[in-house]
Amino acid sequence: MNENDAVRKATLRARAEIDLGALRANVRSLRAHASGAALMAVVKADAYGHGALACARAAVEAGAAWLGTATPQEALALRAPGAGIPADVRVMCWLWTPGGPWREAIEADLDLGVGGMWALEEVTAAARAAGRPARVHLKADTGLGRGGCAPADWAGLVAAARAAEAGGLLRVVGLWSHLACADEPGHPSIEAQLTRFREMVAYAERQGVDPEVRHIANSPAVLTLPESHFDLVRTGVAMYGVSPSPAIGAPADFGLRQVMTLTASLALVKHVPGGHGVSYGHHYVTPGTTTLGLVPLGYADGIPRHASSAGPVLVEGKLRTVSGRIAMDQFVVDLGGDEPPPGAEAVLFGPGDRGEPTVEDWAQAAGTIGYEIVTRIGSRVPRVHVNDANDANDVNDARA
């Protein structure tokens, strides 16, 4: 069996097609929104379910100077031999727990987020053991109430970082924070956080900290809050063409295109009489004689059970709705009088060009956010990356 046959057979049941041309175009659009700030492409959680290495490479090709991850393991994978990430691209990680691989991260030339005294002590010890200084971004909690140093503890953290810097153990290259409500335009916490961030940055600089970058803007802030851009912006979900929230607007409003298209092949098509119960609990009963199609994807694949009897699916050009409960491996759609053959394509979501549902449609059906829809697509669904930089038929990239 050759490689093409293997890919074809692996994707017979379902596939998540990842349009790298669209991703590159999105990065360029976001850079245009970024007011001259550098762009960090956030590829945590396997690039929000899209495939971290392929998406990281595509983002860099489109001008991303930084890559961001949550865990150090994710960041180390980007520095592994064969990853294909240029050495001059900065890679930052920020979600640490005590005893983490600080030394490995320092030796891999990663940028390290530090938001508390315990973390500063561990990174300092690791730098001493590694025999080289760490690159550190001090994180301030400006109001999110999650990671980062509380304002009351900021002076102590800054003083300790300056002492370690004077000892040659680290370099404070960044000061940063994260916005709580940037996806709610006009929320009073936004200006309050920006004000506090400016104050905490100014204090650190008065103490002698000379950061290369200051950063607080996430995807919604990149799109709607130019005053938050500072030196570096962090683009996550918007890079994948998914709206941060309905209040922000549709991706197309900002020149963005959805990157992932999720499809499956109908596993079974059959006729049933009226009054026939469908799936667990018989929450759907056929209103009359009809045709049912079995879609071989379920909540084990990340299809949200909360979208039972609500999730939209395009089958042979017609929009259908999940009929009854979504099960672990499969769900059913009522096809009415249509009779597509087994193997016919069911499109769960895509950019919307062919009338198919979008990620936002599924988020609404499940009562959740687009972030969750794409990041939950499971490992049983192969990712097929198309329109890479060397593809002469890269229509999306040529349009940008």
Predicted regions and their residues:
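Active-site anion/phosphate-binding pocket segments in diverse small-molecule metabolic enzymes
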Residues: 1-24, 28, 32, 74, ...
